């Protein structure tokens, strides 16, 4: 387990989304296999007392029937997962998730500074914030971008991180490696990894 004192960031699990296996593509044969593996990897990385910021697209539908005819609800997925989960609204999340609150966006204080968190990259970001975490992995874009205003965008989607949650410490290392590698290649557009 990694050091998770600053919380974990994760998105786009899309539990119950059969077609996401093909769209991304994900390395699973069935949606049941995907759901089970995502839960297993989450619980391997996240402790019972950890905080997880899930930046949208938690599940595809509020109800999912698996191959064993078990009906999974939004709450059923949450009950299988370690940690306290703060859910952000994504474009695939059902509008009413059994009264569970969904955040639109937030600025959180972390050991690497203030970070803007949202499902959608770069929308409504306060100008003084330089680090942005988003969970929109189905943009099929890079994991890290730095724009011409020197804002750092990090996609925390599971598809980019071997289907595990990613910690603040791991994100910090990624950003440092990215900046060091691309320091000489910088132009006024966007850097990508």
Feature map (PLM): residue ranges:
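Conserved beta-sheet core of the metallophosphoesterase superfamily
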Residues: 97-191
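Hydrophobic/aromatic beta-strand patches that form the interior of the parallel beta-sheet core
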Residues: 8-10, 53, 86, 137-139, ...
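Acidic, histidine-bearing metal-coordination/catalytic regions of metal-dependent phosphoesterases
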Residues: 1-29, 162-193
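Core catalytic region of metal-dependent phosphoesterases/phosphodiesterases
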Residues: 2, 10, 15-109
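Generic serine detector
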Residues: 6, 62, 67-70, 118, ...
